[in-house]
From Swiss-Prot:
Active site as annotated: 14 (nucleophile), 16 (proton donor/acceptor)
Name under which the protein is recorded: Probable phosphomannomutase
Binding site for Mg(2+) 2: 226, 228, 231
Pfam families in UniProt: PMM (PF03332)
Pathway: Nucleotide-sugar biosynthesis; GDP-alpha-D-mannose biosynthesis; alpha-D-mannose 1-phosphate from D-fructose 6-phosphate: step 2/2
Organism, scientific name: Caenorhabditis elegans
């Protein structure tokens, strides 16, 4: 049974690297753990991916199942979200900065990525979402093996870090933010449209907001919400570590 203290507390989770291994589906054990935890405290997710990808990862492509697992569901950093099954207004990067600036950004990104030498390149280098643009030097259609190869290459050569710095230098004056997202990409979104965007929907109803994420260092797409004064931030190193952190928080609520 939810106690008065826990009813004013909510646990908010990143998806990739937090509830699942990167771009993998949630395990049955982790899903069951969340179901049991939700009996004691409200739960929310905030992912950078679009709603379709998050539904695939957490609920076997079943939208109704996904919305039944969490009290709040936020994709694209909260720019496409739900309270229960009720949708919030959808935000649009296209309306926010205009097509002319978007095209200038995309053209620059494609030219820049065309000059990067990687072990392999595949397809889907630019993904246009409601509230952001996702840029992937290797291409999002890479296989899991190719993805992991890029991860190691990126660690050694700082491919995404350099890309982010170039984007920030050239387009920062357009009111855009740039963050290293997931394992293979860079997220581009209007200033303030990072994961803290979802907090506007949570702060009125909760006194304590715990956030769990893996990309919490500066430049990572979990950093802003992790460091926000309105949250209690937890850095995790994968689903099993997330579970341990949650168990510790639940003990404190007892």
């Amino acid at each position: 049974m939810t106690s008065p203290a826990s009813s004013r507390t909510i646990l908010v989770f990143d998806v990739d690297g937090t509830l699942t291994a990167a771009r993998q589906t949630i395990t049955p054990e982790m899903r069951e753990f969340l179901i049991e935890a939700r009996k004691r405290v409200p739960l929310a997710i905030v992912g950078g991916s679009d709603f379709k990808k998050i539904t695939e990862q957490l609920a076997d492509h079943d939208k109704d199942l996904l919305l039944s697992l969490f009290d709040y569901t936020f994709s694209e950093n909260g720019l496409y979200g739900f309270k229960g099954t009720e949708p919030y207004p959808v935000q649009s990067i296209q309306k926010a900065i205009g097509d002319a600036k978007l095209q200038e950004l995309i053209n620059f990104a494609l030219r820049y990525m065309s000059d990067i030498q990687l072990p392999v390149k595949r397809g889907n280098f630019v993904e246009f979402r409601n509230g952001m643009i996702n840029l992937s030097p290797i291409g999002r259609s890479c296989s899991q093996e190719e993805r992991m190869q890029f991860v190691e290459f990126d660690k050694k050569h700082g491919i995404r870090q350099k890309f982010t710095e170039q984007l920030r230098e050239k387009f920062g004056q357009y009111g855009l933010q740039f963050a290293i997202g997931g394992q293979i990409s860079v997220d581009v979104f209007p200033t303030g449209w990072d994961k803290t965007f979802c907090l506007q929907y949570l702060v009125p109803d909760f006194d304590t907001i715990h956030f769990f994420g893996d990309k919490t260092a500066p430049g990572g797409n979990d950093h802003e919400i992790f460091a926000d004064e309105r949250t209690v931030g937890h850095t995790v190193e994968g689903p099993e570590d997330t579970r341990k952190h949650v168990e510790n928080v639940l003990k404190e609520l007892d």
